[in-house]
Amino acid sequence: MAERLSEDARKAAVKALSGWSEVAGREAIARVFTFRDFNEAFGFMARVALVAEKNDHHPEWRNVYKTVEVVLATHDAGGVTERDIRLAEAMNAIARQFGVA
């Protein structure tokens, strides 16, 4: 099982992640990605889904038209772990392929 990050480590990791923030009232991180249209948003989700499945670590997410809202936390660890940080980094890299910084 992945170990939950300390508060200091979590804050430092989130600070280094473009667009991500801590979720109020919950030990989790979140980001909203906005694409040009639904096709791009869905394409992003499809690519992320492959990464998530390969790593057996799945996001909580919601898609409305061109927006994808994401929350990451490792439920078994009760908070944010290195697995969440790595998935957030991968999501940012995939979003950049669509021109989303």
From Swiss-Prot:
InterPro entries: PCD_sf, Pterin_deHydtase. It comes from the Bacteria. Keywords: Lyase. GO terms for molecular function: 4-alpha-hydroxytetrahydrobiopterin dehydratase activity. Disulfide bonds: none annotated. Its EC number is 4.2.1.96. The keyword Lyase applies. CDD domains: PCD_DCoH_subfamily_b. The keyword Lyase applies. One of its GO terms (biological process) is tetrahydrobiopterin biosynthetic process. Pfam families: Pterin_4a (PF01329). It catalyses: (4aS,6R)-4a-hydroxy-L-erythro-5,6,7,8-tetrahydrobiopterin = (6R)-L-erythro-6,7-dihydrobiopterin + H2O. Belongs to the pterin-4-alpha-carbinolamine dehydratase family. This is Putative pterin-4-alpha-carbinolamine dehydratase. It comes from Nitrobacter hamburgensis (strain DSM 10229 / NCIMB 13809 / X14).
